[in-house]
Amino acid sequence: MAYERFTSAITLLLHWRNRLDPYWKLARGDRPVGFLLLLWPTWWALWLAADGVPPWWTLCVFTTGIWLTRSAGCVINDYTDRWLDPHVERTCTRPLVTGTVSPRNALLMFATLMLIAFGLVLTMNQLTVLLSVAGLFLAMTYPYLKRYTHLPQVYLGLAFGWGIPMAFAAIQGKVPTLAWLLYIANILWTTAYDTWYAMVDRDDDIKMGAKSIAILFAELDLVVQGVLYTLMLLTLCLVGLRATLSHTYWISLISAVALIGYQFIIARRREPTACFRAFMHNNWVGMTIFAGIALATTH
């Protein structure tokens, strides 16, 4: 009897695992790099706003909220891209394409994730709650941009960095100039690394009529990348000067320059797999800058 109960429990667990696995993949739970690329800039903001380690509850709310909103963003992105994904090699096996998740269930999942995230935001102050509404608008409208403009990467930067003004609002009750400088730096960074991502899908996107910076600038893509990363680093220099950060921050920026340079070495021939590696490598850039900020604000 005990053995039968054990095998029944294992069978039940495997059944639910198989049922939930497509939803986990839809939310990109199996690909944490997107979460990390969203996490680092928000942590930059939290540590700068608090001038050190932020309050534990605020840190928990923002970290959990980042995972929830990033997952929700992936769900709504796949929902709006279900016309395109079957024709792109990298995305043709996504759950909405294969039918393992229905469009209706995807929308329900998006709504559930966003409601939980909003519930967490409600524990913050009024300004943070108001800013979160703008963040919801950015998250919901981003997936449609690639149909109408060659600059969806810029809009992704607006959406991905919105945790920065929210973090300052939560801790300081205002959004100072420092927050907007950091926000601009993150827009430039996101635009740059998502252009690597767009270079992976460029050929398929051209066939399907989708738009991106990689398509717009064609052979000048690497030049544009260089300009974006340079402007990002210069803006982060302004952040360091305005916040009067110590030498550890400046060391982290120098390290970030080396890491970014390595991306151009990786992707110099524009091969899709190499461009994807360059995209993934930005996790180390974000982490390095965070380490510099965290050490510079340690008292």
From Swiss-Prot:
It is found in: Cell inner membrane. Keywords: Cell inner membrane, Cell membrane, Magnesium, Membrane, Transferase, Transmembrane, Transmembrane helix, Ubiquinone biosynthesis. GO terms for cellular component: plasma membrane. The chain crosses the membrane at residues 33-53, 56-76, 107-127, 151-171, 180-200, 213-233, 247-267, 278-298. Its main location: membrane. NCBIfam families: ubiA_proteo (TIGR01474). HAMAP family: UbiA. Catalyzes the prenylation of para-hydroxybenzoate (PHB) with an all-trans polyprenyl group. Mediates the second step in the final reaction sequence of ubiquinone-8 (UQ-8) biosynthesis, which is the condensation of the polyisoprenoid side chain with PHB, generating the first membrane-bound Q intermediate 3-octaprenyl-4-hydroxybenzoate. This is 4-hydroxybenzoate octaprenyltransferase. It comes from Xylella fastidiosa (strain M12). The gene is ubiA.
